[in-house]
Amino acid sequence: MALIDAIHAREILDSRGNPTVEVEVLLSDGQIGRAAVPSGASTGEHEAVELRDGDKGRYLGKGVQKAVDAVIDQIAPALTGFDATDQRSIDQAMLDLDGTPNKGKLGANAILGVSLAVANAAAASADLPLYKYLGGPNAHVLPVPLMNILNGGSHADSDVDIQEFMIAPIGAETFSEGLRWGVEVYHNLKSVLKEQGLSTGLGDEGGFAPNLPSNRAALDLIQEAIKNAGYTPGKDIALALDVASSEFFKDGAYQFEGKALSASEMSAYYAELVADYPLVSIEDPLDENDWEGWKTLTDAIGDKVQLVGDDLFVTNPAILQRGIDTRTANSLLVKVNQIGSLTETLDAVSLAQRAGYTTITSHRSGETEDTTIADISVATNAGQIKTGAPARSERVAKYNQLLRIEEELDDAARYAGRSAFPRFKG
């Protein structure tokens, strides 16, 4: 039995140049686990609290020294001596120590950093890769990458309302092949943008961020890039969206493409998109508090396309249960820092899968070189992963880890492919 011997935390930088928390856990057998915590740009109002210092004279108020201190001064003494493999008890001890419903005392960034570092240390102690330690012998499904190759919304400085335009290589036989297809489309998209005199500057997640006249124009450009790369839209590579509609929901209406639209008008717009394009997934199509609109949309097109709750569910099992009970949405986006502990994350995934909801393991726009989510994706057989464009090392690190996992699994590896999107009839 390996016990927790020491826990240390430090302030490091994420991919946006903002501070974040990194934690190291030392076990009694000498093994060390490390984890770094991501941070989002478009955040749901029901997410667990990310503790920031608020000192404008240091990192413009975005320092995380309070969270670091919480790890060192409060969490570390409380967890010393715990069996590192008892993840649920460790996470519960931190929740009890925090004592708030949203982790507002210690900070979700402090709790999550420790939670993930413990898992990494325990896996090392067991001499197992993290995906196998968490998922056991049945962890073998490699996810379809939802690759964010064109950015709008709060991830880019442009007139495009939708935050992420993604490609999904559903026709590939293996993860490595799917990744290659995505990379080829990404580079072809750059060529298309250059030919049209459009910007090839990058957004937060590595996707291009040109100033386009409409959201449909973005989809058309991507389809052109898919064809130029030698692939067939809908057969080889499908499209997916993250609308992040809470970002443009103001005064009871959706401020979209220069108009103030109702939920029913937005739903009609999405129905047209699903009819006109090979769309397999739409994330956060409506505001996180517009449950009535979400239900109507699910009833209307939920049998044709994956409707993903990100801000709607914030990886929270209690909120997800409401969605399941009311048959609202049909997919869960899984972000470890939304809920703030590994145990709660795995509980949410398990609940979703039992209810027939698809699951997508996801990064945040502020990322680090930490690859834990790649292992979580395989551990849970999630079937899909969002971790940005095939550019910028903090994104590519996750793809490279999945390549390693696929190689290690060898003949046991199965690529989710088209089966990850059971509602898509394209």
From Swiss-Prot:
Cofactor note: Binds a second Mg(2+) ion via substrate during catalysis.
One of the record's GO cellular component terms: phosphopyruvate hydratase complex
Residues that, per the record, bind Mg(2+): D242, E283, D310
InterPro entries attached to this UniProt entry: Enolase, Enolase-like_C_sf, Enolase-like_N, Enolase_C, Enolase_CS, Enolase_N
Compartments, as annotated in UniProt: Cytoplasm; Secreted; Cell surface
The EC number(s) this enzyme carries: 4.2.1.11
Membership in a protein family: Belongs to the enolase family.
Protein name (Swiss-Prot/TrEMBL): Enolase
Lineage: Bacteria, Bacillati, Actinomycetota, Actinomycetes, Micrococcales
